[in-house]
């Protein structure tokens, strides 16, 4: 057998890692704290310590064609944006199809991962686990950390003077499950992220009054984009990424703001970000603008202080008679089973080469899978990360020197600050990142060659959605069905909506989509050229 690999967590990152290890002839053992797979997507009625937690009404923000495993499309009849139960159903089907369950030890908690005494030469790890009160230790050749980054809630109570005097209920959004207990209540939601907006709009149907407090604002996008197509199938494209990264900054910024304001003017709704040109991940919510218009949700600035029954905002206004405060303030990054010397942090930034490998170890035998965030979906990202990591562990891929890795990290971090802002330390440019990882393992599609040999496919790959299938077209792990999956992705996207057929299916024309978006800039450039 190949090298023994410990995998911590059986969510989508863990399952992708098991599968990638098997593809490379490695011997995986996955440790899962709970009694089931799915991680974040496995709903539970109560938030469990040390596990990700979601509320009952969670739907995906990525559409099914953009968030699947690259060789395992969602069923045709699944909706484009899915309830968490549908995604869990898909995850279970994937695990069974790829025969992954037998490699998982359930109800097993990883208490510590330490360097083996001869780590400098072998790269091995001592992994200690607990099950039914019994501790066991084993030596592994490598470790893949797949425990996610939505586990440990960030609850900055010290940032809110007077909160200790507040007499109502106060808790983090991970403990929120459903709206029933808030009937007739006055609720303040702190934080304008996806969870905060979802919870606020859901509560607005039953609560007496709901307010959202936001320190810096946010762009709010709809899942439904031009002509009713899923947003990511129109916006997450190679051509769009090329334009975004090569247009003059002023034009790129103008187009970005115009695109974000296409549905409604954020200034009018109190949602406008403090720095609107930063490419921070937007919030996806189809109901918030209507809730604000109807007066059942109000947006307020940051909370200056709390009293026993109210919140005083920085603009001097007061929300009185509050029954409950829900902090949708994100999560902290933590790996309590690892020594801090293994995965280092700097200014609240986890230092990882390409978001995967700690750069300062003698041997690169530990990888963090799933510790990035972008406009792209998690599943295809962790699939590529784990494939690369498995090849590095096997020895078929090599990493640069420590110095080169640190230089790359510093350079990328500076770009991230300029592009996404100081607080978005795990944000990344999806297609650029995916191309980078796929190039390491020989799986990056060769676009010029495709235009010469298969122009029909090339047009869809370059101008159409950058779907996960593209990264199983060539190289190790190549999937024979990838070409057909790309050419039929719009059929699968439109299929679940055809419950009342009224005419021929209309697929988008990307030429007119991009022409519409760039019509004004093209006209301005033309006028400038004529005048000069």
From Swiss-Prot:
FAD binds at residues 9-13, 32, 40-41, 61-62. It is a single-pass membrane protein. Its EC number is 1.14.13.148, 1.14.13.32, 1.14.13.8. One of its GO terms (molecular function) is N,N-dimethylaniline monooxygenase activity. GO terms for cellular component: endoplasmic reticulum membrane; intracellular membrane-bounded organelle. Essential hepatic enzyme that catalyzes the oxygenation of a wide variety of nitrogen- and sulfur-containing compounds including drugs as well as dietary compounds. Plays an important role in the metabolism of trimethylamine (TMA), via the production of trimethylamine N-oxide (TMAO) metabolite. TMA is generated by the action of gut microbiota using dietary precursors such as choline, choline containing compounds, betaine or L-carnitine. By regulating TMAO concentration, FMO3 directly impacts both platelet responsiveness and rate of thrombus formation. The chain crosses the membrane at residues 510-530. It is linked to Trimethylaminuria: Inborn error of metabolism associated with an offensive body odor and caused by deficiency of FMO-mediated N-oxidation of amino-trimethylamine (TMA) derived from foodstuffs. Affected individuals excrete relatively large amounts of TMA in their urine, sweat, and breath, and exhibit a fishy body odor characteristic of the malodorous free amine. Changing residue 61 to K: Loss of activity. This is Flavin-containing monooxygenase 3. It comes from Homo sapiens. It catalyses: trimethylamine + NADPH + O2 = trimethylamine N-oxide + NADP(+) + H2O; N,N-dimethylaniline + NADPH + O2 + H(+) = N,N-dimethylaniline N-oxide + NADP(+) + H2O; hypotaurine + NADPH + O2 + H(+) = taurine + NADP(+) + H2O; (S)-nicotine + NADPH + O2 = trans-(S)-nicotine N(1')-oxide + NADP(+) + H2O. It comes from the Eukaryota. Keywords: Disease variant, Endoplasmic reticulum, FAD, Flavoprotein, Membrane, Microsome, Monooxygenase, NADP, Oxidoreductase, Phosphoprotein, Transmembrane, Transmembrane helix.
């Amino acid at each position: 057998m190949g090298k023994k690999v410990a995998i911590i967590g059986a969510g989508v990152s863990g399952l992708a890692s098991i599968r990638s290890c098997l593809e490379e002839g490695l011997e995986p053992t996955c440790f899962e704290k709970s009694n089931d797979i799915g991680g974040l997507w496995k709903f539970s009625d109560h938030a469990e310590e040390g596990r990700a937690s979601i509320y009952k009404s969670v739907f995906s923000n990525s559409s099914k064609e953009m968030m699947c495993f690259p060789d395992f499309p969602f069923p045709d009849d699944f909706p484009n944006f899915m309830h968490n139960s549908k995604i869990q159903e898909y995850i279970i089907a994937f695990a069974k199809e790829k025969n992954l369950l037998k490699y998982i030890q359930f109800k097993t908690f990883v208490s510590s991962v330490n360097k083996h005494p001869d780590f400098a030469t072998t790269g091995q790890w001592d992994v200690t686990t607990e099950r039914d009160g019994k501790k066991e230790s084993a030596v592994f050749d490598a470790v893949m950390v797949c425990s996610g980054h939505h586990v440990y809630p960030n609850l900055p109570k010290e940032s809110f003077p007077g909160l200790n005097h507040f007499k109502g209920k106060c808790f983090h959004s991970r403990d929120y499950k459903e709206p029933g207990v808030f009937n007739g209540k006055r609720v303040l939601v702190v934080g304008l992220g996806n969870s905060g907006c979802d919870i606020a709009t859901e509560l607005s149907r039953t609560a007496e009054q709901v307010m959202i407090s936001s320190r810096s604002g946010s762009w709010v996008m709809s899942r439904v984009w031009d002509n009713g197509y899923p947003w990511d199938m129109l916006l997450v494209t190679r051509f769009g990424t090329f334009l975004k990264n090569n247009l003059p900054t002023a034009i790129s910024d103008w187009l970005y703001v115009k695109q974000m304001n296409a549905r409604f003017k954020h200034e009018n709704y109190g949602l406008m970000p403090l720095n609107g040109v930063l490419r921070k991940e937007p919030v996806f919510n189809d109901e918030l603008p209507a809730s604000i218009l109807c007066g059942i949700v109000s947006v307020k600035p940051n909370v200056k202080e709390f009293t026993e029954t109210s919140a005083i905002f920085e603009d001097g206004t007061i929300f009185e008679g509050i029954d409950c405060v829900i902090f949708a303030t994100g999560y902290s990054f933590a790996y309590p089973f690892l020594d801090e010397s293994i995965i280092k942090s700097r200014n609240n930034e986890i230092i990882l080469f390409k978001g995967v490998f700690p750069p300062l170890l003698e041997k690169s035998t530990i990888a963090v899978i799933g510790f990035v965030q972008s406009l792209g979906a998690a599943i295809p990202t962790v699939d590529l990360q784990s494939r690369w990591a498995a090849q590095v562990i096997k020895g078929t891929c090599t990493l640069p020197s420590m110095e080169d890795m640190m230089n790359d990290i510093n350079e990328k971090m500076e770009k991230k600050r300029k592009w996404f802002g100081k607080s978005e330390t795990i944000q990344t440019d999806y297609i650029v990142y995916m191309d980078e990882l796929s190039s390491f393992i020989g799986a990056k599609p060769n676009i010029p060659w495709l235009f010469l040999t298969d122009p029909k496919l090339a047009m869809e790959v370059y101008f159409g959605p950058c779907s996960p299938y593209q990264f199983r077209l060539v190289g190790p792990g190549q999937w024979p069905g990838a070409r057909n999956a790309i050419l039929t992705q719009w059929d699968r996207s439109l299929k679940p909506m055809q419950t009342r057929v009224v005419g021929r299916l209309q697929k988008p024309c990307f030429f007119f989509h991009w022409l519409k978006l760039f019509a004004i800039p093209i006209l301005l450039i033309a006028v400038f050229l004529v005048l000069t």
